[in-house]
């Protein structure tokens, strides 16, 4: 249904996919790519990055590359688990020639996120997860945020998109687009 909705609206999307799903249902990859969409990595089993080592993550990147014929250039951490303890992921992504990440939530929540973070795409590094690093080689697309009753929160997906009124998410999309930023939405 998502593919059909995107086709109807003449737009494309990036699908951050868990590798084991593509192993079990390889036709999903074909459908995504045949319709002009992008495939990106979301780990092999939806593991929190804190549960992985760099070596295990590198193996997962290789496995995903085999499954997708090297189509993936982007990554999003499950449960937005990129943090100072898992910053090694940035180097692993660069080692495997990834171009971008979209794991940073630019507002602190009880579960994840960062305060004092860039809102626009920026160059991320393992030493700077929240601010542009001119020497960084990986582009970060932070998650979309917005205000609800004066409180800043993620508005692009998950619990928040189910909890917040639709107009709150639509306003966030509009605000991001006014600043020429991509509205990073997840379902």
Predicted segments with their positions:
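N-terminal regions that are enriched for targeting/export leaders
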Residues: 1-4
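Metal-dependent polysaccharide deacetylase catalytic core of the NodB/CE4 family, i.e.
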Residues: 9-88, 98-99, 103-111, 115, ...
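Active-site-adjacent pocket scaffolds in enzyme catalytic domains
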Residues: 77-181, 185
């Amino acid at each position: 249904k998502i593919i059909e909705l995107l086709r109807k609206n003449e737009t494309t999307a990036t699908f951050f996919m868990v590798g084991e799903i593509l192993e079990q249902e390889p036709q999903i990859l074909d459908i995504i790519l045949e319709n002009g969409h992008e495939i990106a990595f979301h780990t092999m089993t939806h593991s929190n990055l804190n549960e992985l080592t760099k070596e295990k993550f590198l193996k997962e990147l290789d496995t995903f590359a085999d499954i997708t014929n090297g189509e993936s250039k982007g990554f999003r951490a499950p449960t937005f688990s990129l943090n100072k303890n898992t910053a090694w992921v940035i180097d692993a992504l660069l080692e495997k020639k990834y171009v971008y990440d979209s794991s940073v939530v630019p507002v602190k929540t009880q579960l994840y996120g960062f305060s004092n973070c860039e809102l626009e795409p920026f160059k991320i590094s393992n030493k700077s997860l929240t601010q542009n690093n001119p020497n960084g080689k990986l582009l970060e697309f932070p998650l979309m945020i917005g205000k609800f009753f004066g409180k800043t929160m993620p508005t692009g997906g998950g619990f928040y998109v189910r909890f917040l009124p639709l107009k709150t998410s639509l306003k966030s999309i509009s605000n991001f687009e006014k600043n020429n930023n991509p509205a990073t939405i997840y379902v």
